[in-house]
C-alpha cells in the first residue's frame, strides 16, 4: 500500500472519484485525465474487499461501471441538496442564496453554536461609528434594556431608533374603545394636525368629531345629502373639507363648526380631496377630483378662511365615462399626480404661479386607482389594476419609472396557495414608509409586498390577511412600522424591517360576526390609531390605560343627528324644526342607536353640558303618534326665558295655521313626561343587523318632533366661544410652514435643473407630453417662501373612487343637473336637485344610498330578446315620514337599475336606469342641462343604423334568427379601428378568437340581441354555431359587441346573400356594380388574392377592383352585383346612379318557408299593419303611438338604447324591413322593455306597455285574426279579473322586505337551552333565516337575480342561489343537515363577490355585514347539531351495553353451540346467494292488525337486537305468494349488518321521496349513473378510509298480486330488503340471519351456481362492472310497473306502530324550491320497529357505532381508526388478543371448531381466533 493511502478515509477516496467524474463530464477534460492518472498511481480510489476480508485496488473505469447508478454530476447534486437541508435546521440570514463560499450564517459549515445571538455590553452600546451608533448585527439577540440604551444615549448623545423603541413596543397597543357612532359604513377617518381630534365620514351623510384622548363625541357636521367619499384637514388645522356623492364639497371651521363654503364645481361624485402643502403668503390651494373626469383647484386664504367659489378647472375626459379616481400632492406642494380610469397618470405643476398640466403618463394598461407621493422627494408611486405598480421620478426632462410586478416572488421562496389561484393580479393600495426607502403594495391575493424604492427589488411578502386589503397606513415617524387593514376585519401592525407581524386585532362584533375595516389612520404623534368599519363603528387604539374610555357609552349619537334639513339657494343648510344653522343649535342630548337618551353621567360629556344642573341633563321625552319615543328639548320644570317663550308661542301659532286641526290632533297625541334622574332608558341589546322594517330610533324619532329647541342669546354667546378643535401652536405652525416652504423651493429647483438636462437615451416610456396651456386660469400665485410638512396626507381610494362606473353619464346618474330619475323631484331650497337613492331590489330599499349603491356595477349583455317579467305581487313600502326634502330622498322605492354596460376592465359610458313618472307627467328639462355637463343631445341620439326603417344591404342590421357568415378578419379590423380611434374601451383579449378556435369564416345564427346606451350605441349579439348541412345548432356560441363604423366593412353577411355571391362567376376584367349609399357605383375587377396570407381560402375582400373614378379598393364578392342588360349608367364616368324602389326591393332578404308562418310575408305584413292601425286608435296605446319627444324628455336617449314605437314598427312592416316573425316579435317586446327601463316599475304606463305588448304579440301569433278589437276586449276582462284578485289579497301580510312598525325583540339564536333533538336545527335555521330576511342588508339577496335585468349573470355564475330558495328548500325538508344549508348560504355570498367586483360599493359592505352576521349565528346551530349527534351516539352505545349485560347469559349459550350456529347459518348462506338485486314483488295491503304469518303459520313477536336498541314488536301480516315462481330478496354484500327493523325504516324514509315521484304506470328503471353517485364517488376517493355501508330492509305489510317494484339504489348507504316477503330459492318464510363483518376484512367472492352472479364481499362500494351487471339484471327482471298509489301507502301501513315523527317523514311532500344535489343521509328514527319473527343479527363489529346521522367531519374522525389492528378486551376476567383480519371463510370455520384454545368470544358475542400470544396469556392464567 502506498504511503498516500495510509490514513486515507473512505469518504476522501469517494470524493476523489466524484471529483474525477465531475471534471470528466465538464469542460476540463485534460484536468480530469491528469487527476484520474494520479489517483490511480497513488491508489486513492475506493478499494474492493473480497470475501476473505482482503482489500484490492480498483481502476477508475471499474468504479464507473460499478457505480453506474451515479450521474456524472452527482457531486454537484450533492452540493445543491446541502443548502436546503441545512436551511431547515439553521436558517441563513439571506434566504434563497445558494453558495458554497459563504461565511457566518451563509456558511455551509455553520452550527447552532456559531450562529447564536450576540449580546453587546454597555460600552459597545455607547460606541460611535462614523459619528453614529453602530448597527446591530443580524444575529443580535433581544434588544438591550431601556436602561442600557438611555445610559448610552447619555454618554454619546445619539441613539438608534430600533434600540430605543424596538418594534416589540407596539405589541402594547390595544383597543381602547369601539364606539357605534354611525348608522352606515364609515369609509373615511382622519386625525387633525394635533392628533387630539378624530373625524369620521360615513354613508349616513354625517361627519363626526371625536376626542382622541377619551373618545367623547364632540360635534356632528350636517349638510351633505349623500355618502361621504373623502375628507381632508388643512395644514393649519383650521378647517375640514368633505366631499360627497352629492357632488358638493362642504368646508367647515374646525374651531366653531360653522360652515365656511359649499363648493359646487363637479357634475358627478367627488372622488378625492387634498389640501395642498404649498405656501405662498396666505394663499393656499384645495384640489378635488370627480367622477366627471374633472379636477378643480380651489384658491383660499389662510388668514380669512375665504374660499373662491370659482375654481381653476381641468376637464380630463378624452372619452365619455372617464373618471378621475385618486390624487396626491408632493411634499412641497409643487406637484400633484392624479390617476384615472383611462389608464393615464396626469402630473400638474404649481411652480409657474398657477396650476398647469406638465405630463400625461400612459404606461399602465388598466385603471390607475391608487397613487402616493413620497414623504421627502419628488418621487411618487402609482398602483393599477393591471397588476403592476410604478415608482416615478423626474429625471432628464422626463418621468422615468421602476416597474413593480405583483407576480414577482421573493428569491428562495415558493409561495403556494392563494397566489396561484388568483388569475389576474391587481394592486389595491400603495404606500411609502416614513423614510421613503421602501414601497408597500397591497395585492388582491391578500398579501402585502415590500419593495426597495430605489431598485424595485422585492424584499418581503407579508401574509396574514384573509381578504383583500385596501388600507395601508405608515407610522408617522417610525419607518419600520406599517398598519394595514382589510375586509377580513383584521388590523395588523407590521415590522417592515424584518417582514413580520408585530400585532393583529380582529374586529369581532358580538352577534354580527366581524366588521370589515374600511379605513385606518395614525395620529401625528404615533400614540393612537383609529379605524372605521362596515357597521358604523369607530375603533380607537393606543398605548396606556383605557380607563378614560370606560367612562363613555358604547353607542353615541346626538338626538339631532338625523333631523331633516332645509337648504337655501347656495345649498347652505338650516335645521328644519328650529330654522337655525346646525352649529348654532344648543348642545344636543346624547342618545343610543334607538334614540333612548343616555344617563346624566354621559350627558355631561357633551360639550356645553359639563356644568349643567342634574335636571337639565335629563331630556324630556314624548311619544309621537307612531308610538316612538322622542327627546323634547325643554323640560317641564325648566325656566324658559321670555325670548324663548315668545318665539315658542309664535312658532306654535304658525304651526297651527299651517296644519289646522291636524296639527292640534297631532299635538294632543304627544304625551309629555319627564324621565326621573335615577332611571335609565335602555335599548334592547343591539345584537344582529338592523331590520329593514325597523328604522333606527335616532333617525326616525324626530321626523315629526315639535320645533321647541331654540337657543337663547346667552346660549349663542357661550356657544360661539367654544373651541371644538384647537389650532396648532404658533411655534409648531410656523416651523411646519417653513419646512413646507423649503421643500417647495427644493422641488422647483430640482425640476428646473432636470428640465435643462439633455436626454441620455430616448426611452419608449415616460415621455413628457407637453400640453398647450389653453385653460383659463383665474388665480395667480406668488411663490414666496413656501414649505410643507408631509403630515396626514392620504392617498386611499375612497368609496366613490373605487366604485365601478364603466359607461358614460356618471354625472347625469348622480343627478344634480338632471331630474329625470325621480318620480317626485326633491326640491331643496329652491334648487332642483335630484338625489336618486334606490338600487335594484324586489322590496324596499335603503334609506340612504346613492349611485354608489348599485350592487352590480359591472355589466354584461343581454343574450336573449326581452321577455315578459314574471308577475309579482308587491306591497307599497311605507314611508318613514312625510318630510318635504330629505324624506323624498329616503323614500323606499321599487327600482331596477339599468345594468352598467361594461366589464370590469372597460371604462366606457354607463347607462344608468332612469325612472319615468307615471303617464309621462314629468317636469320638462331644458336641453341646456345636458350641455351644462359637456354633452349635447345629438351625441346620445341613436345612429341611423339603428333607427332606419328601410331595409338596406349595407350596413347590415342584425335581426333575431338571422343566419349569417361571421368573418374573423373583418371583426379584427373593427376591433383595431375602435382601439385606434379610442371610440370606446375594448379589450382585444376578450374577443372570441382568444376564447375558441375560429376559422376564417363561420356559419352562425343570431340567438340574442341587445343594444347598449353609450357613445356610441353598441349592438350586443350572441352568435350560435350552425351546422351548414343540417341547419341545426351545434351547441357552441360566443358573444360580441360592435356598431356601424365608417371605413369598416361589414363582417356579418346574411347566409342568403353569401350563397348567392359564392357561385357567381367573376373573372379578371369583369365589370360590376355595387350599392353604396343607396346608389349604384361601377367598377372593374383587376385581380383576386386573399386579404391576408394566413387565410388563403377566405372570400373576405379577396378582389382588387378599380372604380370608374380611378380609385382602387378591395371588395368582397357579396358586395358586387352583375350589371343587367337594362341597367342605367351614369351620364358622367365615375359618378353613381340612384337606386329605384324596384331595385331596392329586389335586393332585400327573401324569406324562407315558415319564417312568416303559413302565409306569405306580404299578406302577414298587411294583416299586422291593419291590426296596428286598430291598436293605435285605443287610448291605452296612445303613449306608444309615436316616438318619444326628446325635447320634452332629453334624457330618454341616455337611458334607452333602441327606441321604438308602434308607428315605427308599422312603417318597417310596410317597407318589409323584418325578415321573419321572430324579428318582429323581438321589437314588439322592446316597447315594454323600454318603458320598464325608463319608468318606475308598477306605474300605469308600465302596465299599459305590458298590456299593449301582450295584445300585439297575441295578435301576431294568431294568423287567423284580422281584428284586434275583440282580442283587446277579452284580454281587458282578464286583466280586470286578475286585478280584483290582487286587491282581495292586498291585506295578506307581505314579504319580509316590507316596512314593519312593530318592533319585535331581537333574539340571539345562541341564547337558548341546550337541545339534544337532532331535528332542532331546522327550527333554529328557520329563525335565523327570518332574522336575515328582517335585516336591511339582506335585500339584494332575498330573491333570485332577474336574468332579464342582468342577462350575463348565468355566464358568470354557474349555480345561482338566494335566500328565498334557501328558505323554500328548508321548508320542503330537503336539507339533511345544517351543513348543507350553510353551504348554500355561503354560495350566495361567493356568487355576489364573483359577479360584483367593486369592493367598496355600498352593496359590498352590506354583503360583508350579512355574511359575518350569518357566520356568527350559524356557528351555534352547527355546534348544537354536533352536540346532539354526540349525545345520541353516547346514548345509543349505553343502551347497547345495558342490553348486552341483560342478555349476556343467553348470547353466550347461543354462541357456544356449534350445532345451533349451523342451523342459523344455513338460511344466511342461502340468502346471500341471490340473482337480481332488489327485485321485490309486492301485493295488496291487508288490514294492518291481521295475524302475521310466515309460510302460512302465525308467528309470535320476536326480540331483535339492533345497533341502537332491542325492542319487542307486534307481528306483521305476511302472506305466502300463490304463484310458483320464486320471489327473490337480496341483501347487500357490503361489509354491513342488515337490520330488518330500524334500518328498513330508515331506508323507507329515504325512499319515500323517490317513491312519491313515481306517478306513471309505465315500467321504470333506476340507473346507477347519477350525479349524486358521481359526486359521492369523488368524495369517497378523497377519504382515507372507506365508509361502512349500512344494509337495511325495506318492507311491505303484504304483497300485491301481479305487481312488482324494482328499487335500485346501489350507490346509497342502505340497500333494500322486504322481510315480509322473503323467499330463498323458491321456498318462503325463513328469514335470513345476516352476519356483519368487522373492519379490515379481505374481500371474499361467492359464486351463485344457479344464476352465475358474482358477489364481491368487501366494504365500501361495489365495483363498477358489478354495478353494471346488476343494473342490467335489474332491468331484465323489472316486469311490473310501480304504482305510485300503492308504494307510499304500503309503506305507511307497515309503519303503523311508529311514532308521528316517522309518519311525517314518510308522508313528506315532494321537494320544493330548488333541489340541490346532495348525498343521501340516514335519518334518525329511534323508536319501535316492526320486523318478522326469528330474525336475529349475528354481529361481527367490535366498534361502537350508531345509526344516527353523523356529521361528515365527525365521521371522518371516527373512521380514522378503522384499519385492521390488534384489539384487547378486558372485562375483569381474562385478556385475549385477537386479530380482525381473518377472512369470512375462516370465520365460518371457527364456528365448527371444538378446540377451546383456538377461538374465543368477544364481549359482543363474536367469535375471535386467538393469537399465540393470547393463548400464552390464557395458559398463564
Swiss-Prot record:
Any one Gene Ontology BP term: positive regulation of DNA-templated transcription
Family annotation (SMART domains): BROMO (SM00297), WD40 (SM00320)
Tissue expression profile of the protein: Widely expressed with most abundant expression detected in pancreatic islets, brain and skeletal muscle. Predominantly expressed in developing and regenerating neurons. Expressed in adult brain (granular layer of the olfactorium bulb, hippocampus, dentate gyrus and cerebellum internal granular layer). Expressed in the CA3 region of adult hippocampus, adult and fetal retina, perinatal dorsal root ganglion and embryonal olfactory epithelia (at protein level).
Chain segments carrying region Mediates interaction with IRS1: 924-1129
Modified residues (Phosphothreonine): 1359
UniProt feature, compositional bias: Basic and acidic residues: 800-810
Compositionally biased region (Polar residues): 665-681, 1471-1482, 1556-1576
WD repeats: 181-222, 224-262, 265-310, 319-360, 363-402, 422-461, 464-504, 512-551
Bias type Low complexity, positions: 841-854, 1447-1457
Residues the record lists as Phosphoserine modifications: 136, 641, 659, 674, 677, 683, 692, 879-881, 911, 1281, 1283, 1296, 1315, 1405, 1479, 1525, 1560, 1651, 1762, 1783
N6-acetyllysine PTM sites in chain numbering: 1497, 1533
Key word Plastid present: no
Main function: Probable regulator of the insulin and insulin-like growth factor signaling pathways. Stimulates cell proliferation through regulation of cyclin transcription and has an anti-apoptotic activity through AKT1 phosphorylation and activation. Plays a role in the regulation of cell morphology and cytoskeletal organization.
Protein name: PH-interacting protein
The organism of origin for this protein: Mus musculus (Mouse)
Amino acid at each position: 500500500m502506498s504511503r498516500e493511502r495510509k490514513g486515507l478515509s473512505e469518504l476522501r477516496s469517494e470524493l476523489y472519484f466524484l471529483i474525477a467524474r465531475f471534471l470528466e463530464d465538464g469542460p476540463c477534460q485534460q484536468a480530469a485525465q491528469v487527476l484520474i492518472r494520479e489517483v490511480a498511481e497513488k491508489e486513492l480510489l475506493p478499494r474492493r474487499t473480497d470475501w476473505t476480508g482482503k482489500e484490492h485496488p480498483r481502476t477508475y473505469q471499474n468504479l464507473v461501471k460499478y457505480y453506474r447508478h451515479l450521474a456524472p454530476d452527482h457531486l454537484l447534486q450533492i452540493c445543491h441538496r446541502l443548502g436546503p437541508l441545512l436551511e431547515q435546521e439553521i436558517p441563513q440570514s439571506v434566504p434563497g442564496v445558494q453558495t458554497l463560499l459563504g461565511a457566518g450564517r451563509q456558511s455551509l459549515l455553520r452550527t447552532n453554536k456559531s450562529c447564536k445571538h450576540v449580546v453587546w455590553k454597555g460600552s459597545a452600546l455607547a460606541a460611535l461609528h462614523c459619528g453614529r451608533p453602530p448597527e446591530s448585527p443580524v444575529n443580535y439577540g433581544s434588544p438591550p434594556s431601556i436602561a442600557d440604551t438611555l445610559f448610552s444615549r447619555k454618554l454619546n448623545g445619539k441613539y438608534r431608533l430600533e434600540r430605543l423603541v424596538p418594534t416589540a413596543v407596539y405589541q402594547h397597543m390595544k383597543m381602547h374603545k369601539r364606539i357605534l357612532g354611525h348608522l352606515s359604513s364609515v369609509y373615511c377617518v382622519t386625525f387633525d394636525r394635533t392628533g387630539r381630534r378624530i373625524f369620521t365620514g360615513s354613508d349616513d351623510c354625517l361627519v363626526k368629531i371625536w376626542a382622541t384622548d377619551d373618545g367623547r363625541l364632540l360635534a356632528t357636521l350636517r349638510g351633505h345629502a349623500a355618502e361621504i367619499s373623502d375628507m381632508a384637514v388643512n395644514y393649519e388645522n383650521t378647517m375640514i373639507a368633505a366631499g360627497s356623492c352629492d357632488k358638493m364639497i362642504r368646508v367647515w371651521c374646525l374651531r366653531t363648526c360653522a360652515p365656511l363654503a359649499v363648493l359646487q364645481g363637479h357634475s358627478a361624485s367627488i372622488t378625492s380631496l387634498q389640501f395642498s402643502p404649498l405656501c405662498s403668503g396666505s394663499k393656499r390651494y384645495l384640489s378635488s377630483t370627480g367622477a366627471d373626469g374633472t379636477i378643480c383647484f380651489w384658491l383660499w386664504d389662510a388668514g380669512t378662511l375665504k374660499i373662491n367659489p370659482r375654481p381653476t378647472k381641468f376637464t380630463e375626459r378624452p372619452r365619455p365615462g372617464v373618471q378621475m379616481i385618486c390624487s396626491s400632492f408632493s411634499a412641497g406642494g409643487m406637484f400633484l399626480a392624479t390617476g384615472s380610469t383611462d389608464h393615464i397618470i396626469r402630473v400638474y405643476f404649481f411652480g409657474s404661479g398657477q396650476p398647469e398640466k406638465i405630463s400625461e403618463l400612459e404606461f399602465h394598461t388598466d385603471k390607475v386607482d391608487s397613487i402616493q407621493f413620497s414623504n421627502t422627494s419628488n418621487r411618487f408611486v402609482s398602483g393599477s389594476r393591471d397588476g403592476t405598480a410604478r415608482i416615478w421620478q423626474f429625471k432628464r426632462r422626463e418621468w422615468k419609472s421602476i416597474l413593480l410586478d405583483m407576480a414577482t416572488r421573493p428569491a428562495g421562496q415558493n409561495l403556494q396557495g392563494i397566489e396561484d389561484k388568483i388569475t389576474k393580479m391587481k394592486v389595491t393600495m400603495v404606500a411609502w414608509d416614513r423614510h421613503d426607502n421602501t414601497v408597500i403594495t397591497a395585492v388582491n391575493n391578500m398579501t402585502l409586498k415590500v419593495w426597495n424604492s430605489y431598485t424595485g427589488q422585492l424584499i418581503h411578502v407579508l401574509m396574514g390577511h384573509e381578504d383583500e386589503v385596501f388600507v395601508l397606513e405608515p407610522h408617522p415617524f417610525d419607518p419600520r412600522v406599517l398598519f394595514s387593514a382589510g375586509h377580513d376585519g383584521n388590523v395588523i401592525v407590521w415590522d417592515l424591517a424584518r417582514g413580520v407581524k408585530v400585532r393583529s386585532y380582529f374586529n369581532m362584533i358580538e352577534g354580527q360576526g366581524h366588521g370589515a375595516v374600511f379605513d385606518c389612520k395614525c395620529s401625528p404623534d404615533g400614540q393612537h390609531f383609529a379605524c372605521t368599519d362596515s357597521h358604523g363603528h369607530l375603533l380607537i387604539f393606543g398605548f396606556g390605560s383605557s380607563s378614560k374610555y370606560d367612562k363613555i357609552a358604547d353607542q353615541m349619537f346626538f338626538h339631532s343627528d338625523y333631523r331633516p334639513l332645509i337648504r337655501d339657494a347656495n345649498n347652505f343648510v338650516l335645521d328644519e324644526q328650529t330654522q337655525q344653522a346646525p352649529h348654532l343649535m344648543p348642545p344636543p342630548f346624547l342618545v343610543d342607536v334607538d334614540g333612548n337618551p343616555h344617563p346624566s353621567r354621559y350627558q355631561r360629556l357633551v360639550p356645553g353640558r359639563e356644568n349643567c344642573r342634574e335636571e337639565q341633563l335629563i331630556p324630556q321625552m314624548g311619544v309621537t303618534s307612531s308610538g316612538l319615543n322622542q327627546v323634547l328639548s325643554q323640560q317641564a320644570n325648566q325656566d324658559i326665558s321670555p325670548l324663548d317663550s315668545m318665539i315658542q308661542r309664535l312658532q306654535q301659532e304658525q304651526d297651527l295655521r299651517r296644519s289646522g286641526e291636524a296639527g292640534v290632533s297631532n299635538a294632543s297625541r304627544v304625551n309629555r313626561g319627564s324621565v326621573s334622574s335615577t332611571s335609565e332608558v335602555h335599548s334592547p341589546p343591539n345584537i344582529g343587523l338592523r331590520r329593514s322594517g325597523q328604522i333606527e330610533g335616532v333617525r326616525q324619532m324626530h321626523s315629526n318632533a315639535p320645533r321647541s329647541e331654540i337657543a337663547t342669546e346667552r346660549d349663542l354667546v357661550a356657544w360661539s366661544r367654544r373651541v371644538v378643535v384647537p389650532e396648532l401652536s404658533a411655534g409648531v405652525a410656523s416651523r411646519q410652514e417653513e419646512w413646507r416652504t423649503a421643500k417647495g423651493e427644493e422641488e422647483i429647483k430640482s425640476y428646473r435643473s432636470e428640465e435643462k438636462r439633455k436626454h441620455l437615451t430616448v426611452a419608449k416610456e415616460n415621455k413628457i407630453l407637453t400640453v398647450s396651456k389653453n385653460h383659463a386660469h383665474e388665480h395667480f400665485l406668488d411663490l414666496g417662501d413656501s414649505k410643507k410638512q408631509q403630515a396626514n396626507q392620504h392617498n386611499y381610494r375612497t368609496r366613490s373612487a373605487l366604485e365601478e362606473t364603466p359607461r358614460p353619464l356618471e354625472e347625469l346618474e348622480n343627478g344634480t343637473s338632471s331630474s329625470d330619475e325621480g318620480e317626485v323631484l326633491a326640491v331643496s331650497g329652491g334648487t332642483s336637485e335630484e338625489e336618486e337613492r334606490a338600487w335594484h331590489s324586489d322590496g324596499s330599499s335603503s334609506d340612504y344610498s346613492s349611485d354608489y349603491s348599485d350592487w352590480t356595477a359591472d355589466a354584461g349583455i343581454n343574450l336573449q330578446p326581452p321577455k315578459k317579467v314574471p308577475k309579482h305581487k308587491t306591497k307599497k313600502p311605507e314611508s318613514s315620514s312625510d318630510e318635504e326634502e330629505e324624506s323624498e330622498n329616503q323614500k323606499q322605492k321599487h327600482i331596477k337599475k339599468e345594468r352598467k354596460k361594461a366589464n370590469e376592465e372597460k371604462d366606457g359610458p354607463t347607462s344608468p336606469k332612469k325612472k319615468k313618472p307615471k303617464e309621462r307627467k314629468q317636469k320638462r328639462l331644458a336641453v341646456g342641462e345636458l350641455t351644462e355637463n359637456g354633452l349635447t343631445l345629438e351625441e346620445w341620439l341613436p345612429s341611423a343604423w339603428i333607427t332606419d326603417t328601410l331595409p338596406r344591404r349595407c350596413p347590415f342590421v342584425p335581426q333575431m334568427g338571422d343566419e349569417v357568415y361571421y368573418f374573423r378578419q373583418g371583426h379584427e379590423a373593427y376591433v383595431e379601428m375602435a382601439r385606434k380611434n379610442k371610440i370606446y374601451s375594448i379589450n382585444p383579449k376578450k374577443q372570441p378568437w382568444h376564447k375558441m378556435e375560429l376559422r376564417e369564416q363561420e356559419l352562425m345564427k343570431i340567438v340574442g340581441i341587445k343594444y347598449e346606451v353609450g357613445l356610441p350605441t353598441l349592438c350586443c349579439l350572441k352568435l350560435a354555431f350552425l351546422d351548414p348541412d343540417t341547419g341545426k345548432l351545434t351547441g357552441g356560441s360566443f358573444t360580441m359587441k360592435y356598431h356601424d363604423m365608417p371605413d369598416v366593412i361589414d363582417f356579418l353577411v346574411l347566409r342568403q346573400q353569401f350563397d348567392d355571391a359564392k357561385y357567381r362567376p367573376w373573372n379578371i376584367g369583369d365589370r360590376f356594380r355595387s350599392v353604396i349609399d343607396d346608389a349604384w357605383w361601377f367598377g372593374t375587377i383587376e385581380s383576386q388574392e386573399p386579404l391576408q396570407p394566413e387565410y388563403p381560402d377566405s372570400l373576405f375582400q379577396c378582389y382588387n377592383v378599380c372604380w370608374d373614378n380611378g380609385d382602387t379598393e378591395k371588395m368582397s364578392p357579396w358586395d358586387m352585383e352583375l350589371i343587367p342588360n337594362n341597367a342605367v349608367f351614369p351620364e358622367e364616368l365615375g359618378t353613381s346612379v340612384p337606386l329605384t324602389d324596384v331595385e331596392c326591393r329586389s335586393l332585400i332578404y327573401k324569406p324562407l318557408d315558415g319564417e312568416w308562418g303559413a302565409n306569405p310575408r306580404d299578406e302577414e305584413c298587411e294583416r299586422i299593419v291593419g291590426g296596428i292601425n286598430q291598436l293605435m286608435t285605443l287610448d291605452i296605446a296612445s303613449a306608444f303611438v309615436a316616438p318619444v319627444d326628446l325635447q320634452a324628455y332629453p334624457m330618454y336617449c341616455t337611458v334607452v338604447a333602441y327606441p321604438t314605437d308602434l308607428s315605427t314598427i308599422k312603417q318597417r312592416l310596410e317597407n318589409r324591413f323584418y325578415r321573419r316573425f321572430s324579428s318582429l316579435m323581438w321589437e314588439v317586446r322592446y316597447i315594454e322593455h323600454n318603458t320598464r327601463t325608463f319608468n318606475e316599475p308598477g306605474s300605469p304606463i308600465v302596465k299599459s306597455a305590458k298590456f299593449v305588448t301582450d295584445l300585439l304579440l297575441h295578435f301576431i301569433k294568431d294568423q287567423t285574426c284580422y281584428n284586434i278589437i275583440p282580442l283587446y276586449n277579452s284580454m281587458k276582462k282578464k286583466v280586470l279579473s286578475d286585478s280584483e284578485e290582487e286587491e282581495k289579497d292586498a291585506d295578506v301580510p307581505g314579504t319580509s322586505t316590507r316596512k314593519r312598525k312593530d318592533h319585535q325583540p331581537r333574539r340571539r339564536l345562541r341564547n337558548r337551552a341546550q337541545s339534544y333533538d337532532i331535528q332542532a336545527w331546522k327550527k333554529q335555521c328557520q329563525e335565523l333565516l327570518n332574522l336575515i330576511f328582517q335585516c336591511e342588508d339582506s335585500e339584494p339577496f332575498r330573491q333570485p337575480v332577474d336574468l332579464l335585468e342582468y342577462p350575463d349573470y348565468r355566464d358568470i355564475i354557474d349555480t345561482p342561489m338566494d335566500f328565498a330558495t334557501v328558505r323554500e328548500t328548508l321548508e320542503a325538508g330537503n336539507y339533511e343537515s345544517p351543513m348543507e344549508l350553510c353551504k348554500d348560504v355561503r354560495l350566495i355570498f361567493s356568487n355576489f363577490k364573483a359577479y360584483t367586483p367593486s369592493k367598496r360599493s355600498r352593496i359590498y359592505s352590506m354583503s360583508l355585514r350579512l355574511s359575518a352576521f350569518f357566520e356568527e349565528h350559524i356557528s351555534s346551530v352547527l355546534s348544537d347539531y354536533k352536540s346532539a349527534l354526540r349525545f345520541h351516539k353516547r346514548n345509543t352505545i349505553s343502551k347497547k351495553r345495558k342490553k348486552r349485560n341483560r342478555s349476556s347469559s343467553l348470547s353466550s349459550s347461543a354462541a357456544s353451540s356449534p350445532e345451533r350456529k349451523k342451523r342459523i347459518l344455513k338460511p344466511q348462506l342461502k340468502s346471500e346467494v341471490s340473482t337480481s338485486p332488489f327485485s321485490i314483488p309486492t301485493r295488496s295491503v291487508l288490514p294492518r292488525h291481521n295475524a302475521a304469518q310466515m309460510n302460512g303459520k302465525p308467528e309470535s313477536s320476536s326480540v331483535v337486537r339492533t345497533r341502537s336498541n332491542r325492542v319487542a314488536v307486534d307481528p306483521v301480516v305476511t302472506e305466502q305468494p300463490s304463484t310458483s315462481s320464486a320471489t327473490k330478496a337480496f341483501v347487500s354484500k357490503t361489509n354491513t349488518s342488515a337490520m330488518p327493523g330500524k334500518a328498513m325504516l330508515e331506508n323507507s324514509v329515504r325512499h319515500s321521496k323517490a317513491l312519491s315521484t313515481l306517478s306513471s304506470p309505465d315500467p321504470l328503471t333506476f340507473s346507477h349513473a347519477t350525479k349524486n353517485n358521481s359526486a359521492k364517488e369523488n368524495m369517497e376517493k378523497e377519504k382515507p378510509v372507506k365508509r361502512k355501508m349500512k344494509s337495511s330492509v325495506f318492507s311491505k305489510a303484504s304483497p300485491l298480486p301481479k305487481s312488482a317494484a324494482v328499487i335500485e339504489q346501489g350507490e346509497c348507504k342502505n340497500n333494500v330488503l322486504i322481510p315480509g316477503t322473503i323467499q330463498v330459492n323458491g321456498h318462503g318464510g325463513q328469514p335470513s340471519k345476516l352476519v356483519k363483518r368487522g373492519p379490515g376484512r379481505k374481500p371474499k367472492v361467492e359464486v351463485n351456481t344457479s344464476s352465475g352472479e358474482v358477489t364481491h364481499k368487501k366494504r365500501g362500494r361495489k365495483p363498477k362492472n358489478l354495478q353494471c351487471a346488476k343494473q342490467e339484471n335489474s332491468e331484465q327482471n323489472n316486469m311490473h310497473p310501480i304504482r305510485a298509489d300503492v308504494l307510499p301507502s304500503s309503506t305507511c301501513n307497515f309503519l303503523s306502530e311508529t311514532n308521528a315523527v316517522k309518519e311525517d317523514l314518510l308522508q313528506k311532500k315532494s321537494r320544493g324550491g330548488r333541489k340541490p344535489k346532495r348525498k343521501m343521509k340516514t335519518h334518525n328514527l329511534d323508536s319501535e320497529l316492526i320486523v318478522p319473527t326469528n330474525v336475529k343479527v349475528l354481529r361481527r363489529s367490535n366498534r361502537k357505532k350508531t345509526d344516527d346521522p353523523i356529521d361528515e367531519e365527525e365521521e371522518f374522525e371516527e373512521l380514522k381508526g378503522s384499519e385492521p389492528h390488534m384489539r384487547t378486551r378486558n372485562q375483569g376476567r381474562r385478556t385475549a388478543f385477537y386479530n380482525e383480519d381473518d377472512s369470512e371463510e375462516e370465520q365460518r370455520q371457527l364456528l365448527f371448531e371444538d378446540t377451546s384454545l383456538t377461538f374465543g368470544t368477544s364481549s359482543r358475542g363474536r367469535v375471535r381466533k386467538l393469537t399465540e400470544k393470547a393463548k400464552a396469556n390464557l395458559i398463564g392464567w
